[in-house]
Amino acid sequence: MSGCCCSRKCPSLPAISLCSTEVSCGGPVCLPSSCRSQTWQLVTCEDSCGSSGCGSQCCQPSCSVSSCCQPVCCEATICEPSCSVSSCAQPVCCEATICEPSCSMGSCCQPVCCEATICEPSCSVSTCAQPVCCEATMCQPSCSVSSCQPVCCETSSCQPVLCLPATCQPVICKPCCCQPVICEPSCCSAVCAVPASCQPMICEPVVCEPACCQPVCPTPSCCPSVCSAASSCQPVGCETSPCEPPCSEASACQPSACMALVCEPVCLRPVCCVQGPCEPPCVSSSCQDSSCCVSSICQPVCPEPSPCLPSVCVPTPCQPSCYIVKRCRSVSCEPISCPSPSCQPACCRPGSSASAICQPACPPRTFYIPSSCKPPCSPVSCRPICRPICSGPITFRQPYVTSITYRPACYRSCYSILRRPTCLASYSYRPVCSRQPCTDSDNDKCDSKKPTSSQPDCADSTPVKTEVSDETPCQPSEIKPASPITREAAAPQPAASKPADR
């Protein structure tokens, strides 16, 4: 008897004889070429099929494009297919015959994985491999409200399911919940190419139905930053999504969910700021300019909701561009009133100190007291501003520039630049001694004005409590402004000028 049950010539496998010449209805039959492993499946025919040659109406599977595709799992054995995750292969198109699983057009076509049975595949959710697209209209998507996982999503690819709808009918191949947890795709663009006139089926669970298919990503790539210069970046029309702040229709604010530390502000709401005259625009890529860096503890202060320029919000007491805001509540930080944006002298550069006071980094020829936040507007007028360390009891410790090169020529010698006295009152600085140091021509005049008592030469100075010694802090001494004075060298000099009858 010739083998009439084979629909085509099957390839031969090692040590397995395929498509024997002596074939009956109970013998092995070749599957179509869509099966990945090209193995066999036992076809149990009825008695009417008999020994008359195995008619093609019951034993020979035929494919139809319009029929429902049921995946069939096969293994490289004869007549006993068993299902496993690795061997769950491509779908096989079959008609509603006796020996093959049939698909009803009115029911939802789910992926089917075979167990170790004969000709009766059963579905197992754990071994579901490939999703199947079916043209069903009365089916509800098999989506769990709690997990919101796609129907058949592999953790390796994390790509949307490819859909091939032929006509304008609703398909359910897309995941019903567009919030995958284990996958991290890019901004969700539906791969299912449905014609414009087709309306896909709406998911039944209302809990997870963002219409724009916006996944909940730990690091979303579609959230524009406030520091971004692109003004056309509008948020996607999502109703409820943890990835984006609520959008206000009254303003054209750019929302952001950036959680940066230094170079980007922490924005939990749409930020609209008016770019001030002394604030340069931010650079979104590297943020090299230190004036656009705002500490994460500073809360953005937005004066007006328009014109919504992409500017960086800085706190009210620390707003000049030539200072780095390190702490929002600084007691001696005053804003700079610059007449024009170009009024940025060379002696006022953004500092990098971690002090609580806005402290500029000035050239050696210029010295700034941190409380004086008004630098000159031209490099030639950078005259040293001499202020005493302690003009009276002050309650806080002044963070002075500790470098000896920043010491001005008119700075008083009785206060070492390396000493940081602790003061005991709280009012503003007031100048005490602003005279220039004695020159060579004025040595006689300076010698005649040397005090003979232990009182300081400044009349309005008050005693201060220093950290080094208990001696009188305002004993005049002869100094050289250009030479550095250390803690050891400056300490013995006041003791040498003490009166003998003390």
UniProtKB/Swiss-Prot annotation:
InterPro entries: KAP (IPR002494)
Per-repeat ranges for Sequence: 4-8, 58-62, 73-77, 93-97, 108-112, 113-117, 133-137, 152-156, 177-181, 187-191, 212-216, 222-226, 272-276, 292-296, 347-351
TM helices/strands, residue ranges: none
Keywords noted in UniProt: Keratin, Repeat
GO terms under cellular component: cytosol; keratin filament
Top-level taxon: Eukaryota
Pfam families tied to this protein: Keratin_B2_2
Biased segments, Low complexity type: 489-502
15 X 5 AA repeats of C-C-X(3): annotated span: 73-307
Region annotation Disordered: where it falls in the sequence: 435-502
Entry annotated with the keyword Nucleotide-binding: no
PANTHER family referenced in this protein's UniProt entry, alphabetically: KERATIN ASSOCIATED PROTEIN (PTHR23262), KERATIN-ASSOCIATED PROTEIN 16-1 (PTHR23262:SF55)
Subunit structure: Interacts with hair keratins.
Family affiliation: Belongs to the KRTAP type 16 family.
Biological function: In the hair cortex, hair keratin intermediate filaments are embedded in an interfilamentous matrix, consisting of hair keratin-associated proteins (KRTAP), which are essential for the formation of a rigid and resistant hair shaft through their extensive disulfide bond cross-linking with abundant cysteine residues of hair keratins. The matrix proteins include the high-sulfur and high-glycine-tyrosine keratins.
Protein name as it appears in the record: Keratin-associated protein 16-1
Organism of this sequence: Mus musculus (Mouse)
Annotated gene: Krtap16-1
